Protein backbone atom coordinates (compact mmCIF):
# COMPACT_ATOMS: atom_id res chain seq x y z
CA UNK A 1 0.00 0.00 0.00
CA UNK A 2 1.51 3.33 -0.97
CA UNK A 3 1.84 6.08 1.66
CA UNK A 4 -0.99 8.26 0.37
CA UNK A 5 -3.44 5.37 0.36
CA UNK A 6 -2.28 4.31 3.82
CA UNK A 7 -2.72 7.87 5.10
CA UNK A 8 -6.26 8.05 3.72
CA UNK A 9 -7.00 4.68 5.30
CA UNK A 10 -5.74 5.86 8.71
CA UNK A 11 -7.86 9.01 8.57
CA UNK A 12 -10.93 7.09 7.37
CA UNK A 13 -10.75 4.38 10.02
CA UNK A 14 -9.99 6.88 12.78
CA UNK A 15 -12.79 9.10 11.51
CA UNK A 16 -15.30 6.26 11.54
CA UNK A 17 -14.40 5.42 15.12
CA UNK A 18 -14.45 9.07 16.21
CA UNK A 19 -17.78 9.84 14.56
CA UNK A 20 -19.32 6.69 16.04
CA UNK A 21 -18.02 7.60 19.49
CA UNK A 22 -19.47 11.11 19.16
CA UNK A 23 -22.84 9.69 18.09
CA UNK A 24 -22.78 7.30 21.07
CA UNK A 25 -22.02 10.22 23.40
CA UNK A 26 -24.96 12.22 22.04
CA UNK A 27 -27.30 9.23 22.43
CA UNK A 28 -26.05 8.56 25.96
CA UNK A 29 -26.56 12.15 27.05
CA UNK A 30 -30.01 12.30 25.45
CA UNK A 31 -30.99 9.11 27.26
CA UNK A 32 -30.28 10.95 30.51
CA UNK A 33 -32.63 13.72 29.39
CA UNK A 34 -29.89 16.28 28.71
CA UNK A 35 -31.44 18.50 26.03
CA UNK A 36 -31.84 22.02 27.44
CA UNK A 37 -28.24 22.94 26.61
CA UNK A 38 -25.99 21.29 24.00
CA UNK A 39 -23.86 19.48 26.59
CA UNK A 40 -23.07 16.58 24.27
CA UNK A 41 -21.21 18.84 21.85
CA UNK A 42 -19.47 20.62 24.70
CA UNK A 43 -18.50 17.28 26.26
CA UNK A 44 -17.04 15.77 23.08
CA UNK A 45 -15.18 18.99 22.32
CA UNK A 46 -13.64 19.07 25.81
CA UNK A 47 -12.71 15.37 25.74
CA UNK A 48 -11.35 15.61 22.20
CA UNK A 49 -9.37 18.74 23.01
CA UNK A 50 -7.90 17.09 26.09
CA UNK A 51 -6.78 13.99 24.21
CA UNK A 52 -5.43 16.04 21.31
CA UNK A 53 -3.43 17.99 23.90
CA UNK A 54 -2.07 14.70 25.25
CA UNK A 55 -1.15 13.58 21.75
CA UNK A 56 0.63 16.88 21.05
CA UNK A 57 2.52 16.75 24.35
CA UNK A 58 3.50 13.13 23.77
CA UNK A 59 4.67 13.94 20.23
CA UNK A 60 6.96 16.64 21.61
CA UNK A 61 8.74 14.04 23.77
CA UNK A 62 8.48 10.83 21.75
CA UNK A 63 8.47 10.13 18.04
CA UNK A 64 4.95 9.61 16.68
CA UNK A 65 4.55 8.04 13.27
CA UNK A 66 2.68 9.89 10.57
CA UNK A 67 0.10 7.11 10.42
CA UNK A 68 -0.51 7.32 14.19
CA UNK A 69 -0.83 11.10 14.04
CA UNK A 70 -3.26 10.87 11.13
CA UNK A 71 -5.29 8.06 12.72
CA UNK A 72 -5.58 9.67 16.17
CA UNK A 73 -5.31 13.41 15.55
CA UNK A 74 -6.96 13.92 12.18
CA UNK A 75 -9.24 10.88 12.02
CA UNK A 76 -10.42 9.83 15.46
CA UNK A 77 -10.23 13.11 17.35
CA UNK A 78 -11.07 15.22 14.30
CA UNK A 79 -14.31 13.30 13.78
CA UNK A 80 -15.04 13.03 17.50
CA UNK A 81 -14.96 16.78 18.04
CA UNK A 82 -17.33 18.87 16.04
CA UNK A 83 -17.02 22.54 15.23
CA UNK A 84 -19.72 22.42 12.56
CA UNK A 85 -22.32 21.03 14.96
CA UNK A 86 -21.22 23.56 17.55
CA UNK A 87 -21.74 26.37 15.02
CA UNK A 88 -25.21 25.14 14.02
CA UNK A 89 -26.21 24.84 17.69
CA UNK A 90 -25.08 28.42 18.38
CA UNK A 91 -27.13 29.72 15.45
CA UNK A 92 -30.16 27.63 16.51
CA UNK A 93 -30.00 28.92 20.08
CA UNK A 94 -29.66 32.51 18.90
CA UNK A 95 -32.53 32.09 16.41
CA UNK A 96 -34.74 30.81 19.24
CA UNK A 97 -33.97 33.92 21.26
CA UNK A 98 -31.72 31.98 23.64
CA UNK A 99 -28.91 34.51 23.38
CA UNK A 100 -27.47 33.78 26.83
CA UNK A 101 -27.34 30.05 26.09
CA UNK A 102 -25.72 30.78 22.71
CA UNK A 103 -23.10 33.02 24.33
CA UNK A 104 -22.43 30.47 27.07
CA UNK A 105 -22.08 27.71 24.49
CA UNK A 106 -19.47 29.77 22.64
CA UNK A 107 -17.62 30.73 25.82
CA UNK A 108 -17.64 27.24 27.31
CA UNK A 109 -16.46 25.54 24.11
CA UNK A 110 -13.67 28.02 23.47
CA UNK A 111 -12.42 28.54 27.01
CA UNK A 112 -12.85 25.02 28.38
CA UNK A 113 -11.49 23.28 25.26
CA UNK A 114 -8.39 25.47 25.23
CA UNK A 115 -8.01 24.82 28.96
CA UNK A 116 -8.37 21.07 28.30
CA UNK A 117 -5.51 21.14 25.77
CA UNK A 118 -3.36 23.12 28.20
CA UNK A 119 -4.25 20.81 31.12
CA UNK A 120 -3.44 17.71 29.10
CA UNK A 121 -0.08 19.08 28.03
CA UNK A 122 0.77 20.13 31.59
CA UNK A 123 -0.39 16.80 33.00
CA UNK A 124 1.72 14.92 30.50
CA UNK A 125 4.81 17.05 31.09
CA UNK A 126 4.59 16.69 34.88
CA UNK A 127 3.94 12.95 34.90
CA UNK A 128 6.41 11.88 32.22
CA UNK A 129 9.48 13.82 33.29
From Swiss-Prot:
Subcellular location: Cell inner membrane
Keywords, alphabetical: Cell inner membrane, Cell membrane, Ion channel, Ion transport, Membrane, Metal-binding, Sodium, Transmembrane, Transmembrane helix, Transport
Organism in which the protein naturally occurs: Idiomarina loihiensis (strain ATCC BAA-735 / DSM 15497 / L2-TR)
Task of the protein: Fluoride-specific ion channel. Important for reducing fluoride concentration in the cell, thus reducing its toxicity.
GTP-binding listed as a keyword: no
Protein known as: Fluoride-specific ion channel FluC
Gene Ontology terms, MF aspect: fluoride channel activity; metal ion binding
Regulation: Na(+) is not transported, but it plays an essential structural role and its presence is essential for fluoride channel function.
UniProt superkingdom: Bacteria
